[in-house]
């Protein structure tokens, strides 16, 4: 009997598409492109000319896992501060340039690892591309062409009427072509919009038409909650399709929060090694413990742990034991006490007021025992940063 195809695939499709192949760039010591891990960026909120404050915030971002940092350069005093910042920053510094093309050259001379230019608002930018290309090429640094919906070139707006995906892409590729004409191709591109739907379509079109590394971002995303949702939806859609090489979550919040969200997005898609993961139930009428408080206290106690640990915090006996057994460490709470599970086995039962302390102690013990042997026979340090 001949085989009949029912159109059923041999196996499940991959959850994520392969990374889109791009050209490779180096932003300082951080590779950007399909041959490198997806990096997480942020931008300082200090006045750049306040060198000490800016470096202090960069240090905080670095400690939070930031790979690349961008600083604004709106004034001459800011440009004058760039050499000190670029020299002392522990991570690569990108100068963000708007309006004044002269600051592009200042940033290059200052030793910045890259420059972001907004062609929509830099005076006579097209006429200065040859000079910029030569300066960046001589310095061996890349340039990001950062197109924003709110500052599109007038010519593009006259053609399209508004910031459509096609308008964003045309603007970016036009500027890139000018650099290419002068033999410069170390280019990354972003096409940001505050509407995730428009933004996603713009990046899809851009990915189909070029091999430039893409910096993902939703511009003016909003306060922490709203911005987190917008960026997560947009980045998740694109990254699942293999599109995106570096990301910046824009939030009206402490920039450290941008790093936390970006890092979690990548971890959730298995695009970055998972670290601490707290699994907790949403609570309901069956809960016999304050799950919200318990989960928050455990999260706070283990914040910064550099170890892939899954901790389950459950509030009743319905899903609690099952979830706790599937985790590296967990608690199933009820009747004023908690059963502590390690690798699926109950190791002890403790009073409710000792649950948090016990979970933290057990987490540290597991981390020390399971994979923190950096050198055989030598105990490695458990890192929990605050």
UniProtKB/Swiss-Prot annotation:
User: GO molecular function terms here?
Assistant: 4 iron, 4 sulfur cluster binding; 4-hydroxy-3-methylbut-2-en-1-yl diphosphate synthase activity (ferredoxin); 4-hydroxy-3-methylbut-2-enyl-diphosphate synthase activity (flavodoxin); iron ion binding
Catalysed reaction(s)? (2E)-4-hydroxy-3-methylbut-2-enyl diphosphate + oxidized [flavodoxin] + H2O + 2 H(+) = 2-C-methyl-D-erythritol 2,4-cyclic diphosphate + reduced [flavodoxin]
Task: State the needed cofactors, names only.
Answer: [4Fe-4S] cluster
Q: Which residues bind [4Fe-4S] cluster?
A: 281, 284, 316, 323
Q: Name one Pfam family in it.
A: GcpE
Which biological process annotations from GO are given for this protein? isopentenyl diphosphate biosynthetic process, methylerythritol 4-phosphate pathway; terpenoid biosynthetic process
Highest taxon in the source lineage: Bacteria
Sequence similarity: Belongs to the IspG family.
Give the protein's function. Answer: Converts 2C-methyl-D-erythritol 2,4-cyclodiphosphate (ME-2,4cPP) into 1-hydroxy-2-methyl-2-(E)-butenyl 4-diphosphate.
Q: Which PANTHER family match?
A: 4-HYDROXY-3-METHYLBUT-2-EN-1-YL DIPHOSPHATE SYNTHASE, 4-HYDROXY-3-METHYLBUT-2-EN-1-YL DIPHOSPHATE SYNTHASE (FERREDOXIN), CHLOROPLASTIC
Full protein name: 4-hydroxy-3-methylbut-2-en-1-yl diphosphate synthase (flavodoxin)
What organism, scientifically named, is this protein from? Corynebacterium jeikeium (strain K411)
Q: What is the lineage of its organism?
A: Bacteria, Bacillati, Actinomycetota, Actinomycetes, Mycobacteriales
Its gene is ispG
């Amino acid at each position: 009997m001949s085989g009949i195809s029912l159109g059923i695939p041999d196996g499940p499709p991959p959850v994520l598409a392969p990374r889109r192949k791009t050209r490779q760039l180096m932003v300082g010591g951080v590779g950007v492109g399909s041959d490198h891990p997806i990096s997480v960026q942020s931008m300082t909120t200090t006045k750049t000319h306040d060198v000490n404050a800016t470096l202090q915030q960069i240090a905080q971002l670095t400690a939070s896992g930031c790979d690349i940092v961008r600083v604004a350069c709106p004034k001459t005093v800011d440009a004058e501060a760039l050499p000190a910042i670029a020299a002392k920053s522990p991570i690569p510094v990108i100068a963000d340039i708007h309006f004044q093309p002269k600051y592009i050259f200042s940033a290059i001379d200052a030793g910045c690892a890259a420059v972001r230019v907004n062609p929509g608002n830099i005076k006579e930018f097209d006429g200065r591309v040859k000079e910029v290309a030569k300066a960046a090429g001589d310095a061996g640094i890349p340039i990001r062409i950062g197109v924003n919906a709110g500052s599109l070139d007038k010519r593009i707006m006259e053609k399209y009427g508004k910031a459509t995906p096609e308008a964003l892409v045309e603007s970016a590729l036009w500027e890139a072509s000018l650099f290419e004409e002068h033999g410069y191709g170390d280019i990354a591109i972003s096409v940001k919009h505050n509407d995730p739907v428009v933004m996603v379509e713009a990046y899809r079109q851009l990915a189909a038409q070029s091999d430039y590394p893409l910096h993902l971002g939703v511009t003016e995303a909003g306060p922490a909650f709203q911005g987190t949702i917008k960026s997560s939806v947009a980045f998740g859609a694109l990254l699942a399709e293999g599109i995106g090489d570096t990301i910046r979550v824009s939030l009206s919040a402490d920039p450290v929060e941008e790093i936390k969200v970006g890092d979690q997005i990548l971890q959730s898609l298995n695009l970055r090694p998972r670290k601490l993961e707290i699994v907790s139930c949403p609570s309901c009428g069956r809960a016999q413990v304050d799950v919200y408080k318990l989960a928050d206290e455990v999260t706070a106690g283990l914040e910064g742990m550099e170890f892939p640990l899954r901790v389950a915090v459950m509030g009743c006996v319905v899903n609690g034991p099952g979830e706790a057994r599937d985790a590296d460490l967990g608690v199933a709470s009820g009747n004023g006490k908690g059963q502590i599970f390690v690798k699926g086995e109950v190791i002890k039962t403790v009073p409710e007021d000792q649950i948090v302390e016990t979970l933290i102690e057990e987490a540290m013990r597991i981390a020390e025992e399971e994979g923190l042997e950096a050198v055989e026979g030598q105990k490695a340090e458990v890192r929990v940063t605050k």
